[in-house]
């Protein structure tokens, strides 16, 4: 009996968070979820983040990582390098597409923001976007064999996340902006 009570008490914060998340949704999204026409994401994983940096990790010249969302079954790889083109040009922070175009990302100040298109409309395009941010602590190994945590080396560096699997939650859902052509 005590184990069941402990389990219920441990699950209460997660249940309350999900209830608050659903309660804060616009009416039309809540209606889609109620009819099973839309699967809202809850959590995501950033996997195997690696990067190259010419300044020891202060800025990243290129990086790649995996994105996994079990709730929507989206599993894709993401890459940024010198040939990457932003998928938006509307004055917002530039975002870049993963291999699965439903997922975009922004690297800023040591964090990755992931944006996942959800609730496809009649045209097949996502009507809404869920977004969440995860800090990505990195360690860089410089060309001279030195190791620097979060960007203190000065030689060309290979960098990787301190964790191979970074868990994060989506915290926002908004109407999808018009597509950039």
Question: Residue ranges of each PLM-predicted region?
Answer:
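Short, surface-exposed binding/anchoring microloops in extracellular/periplasmic proteins
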Residues: 31-89
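Generic low-complexity segments that are intrinsically disordered, proline-rich and/or Lys/Arg-biased
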Residues: 14, 27, 42, 136, ...
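Fungal secretory targeting signals
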Residues: 1-25
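Conserved beta-strand elements of beta-rich interaction domains across eukaryotes
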Residues: 12-14, 70-72, 119
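Immediate post-signal-peptide N-termini of secreted proteins
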Residues: 17-38, 180-181
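Short, surface-exposed loop motifs enriched in S/T, G, D/E and P with embedded aromatic residues
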Residues: 24-25, 76-78, 170, 175
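Acidic, low-complexity intrinsically disordered segments
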Residues: 89-181
């Amino acid at each position: 009996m005590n184990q069941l009570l402990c389990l219920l008490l441990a699950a209460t914060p997660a249940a309350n968070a999900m209830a608050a998340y659903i309660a804060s949704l616009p009416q039309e999204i809540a209606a889609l979820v109620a009819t099973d026409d839309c699967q809202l994401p809850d959590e995501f994983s950033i996997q195997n983040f690696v990067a190259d940096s010419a300044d020891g990790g202060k800025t990243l010249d290129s990086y790649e990582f995996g994105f996994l969302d079990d709730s929507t079954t989206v599993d894709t790889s993401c890459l940024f390098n010198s040939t990457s083109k932003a998928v938006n040009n509307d004055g917002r922070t530039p975002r870049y597409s993963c291999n699965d175009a439903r997922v975009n990302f922004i690297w800023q100040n040591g964090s990755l923001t992931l944006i996942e298109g959800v609730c496809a409309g009649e045209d097949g395009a996502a009507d809404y976007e869920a977004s969440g941010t995860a800090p990505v602590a990195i360690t860089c190994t410089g060309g001279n064999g030195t190791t620097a945590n979060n960007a203190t080396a000065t030689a060309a560096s290979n960098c990787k996340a301190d964790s191979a699997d970074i868990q994060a939650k989506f915290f926002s859902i908004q109407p999808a902006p018009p597509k950039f052509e």
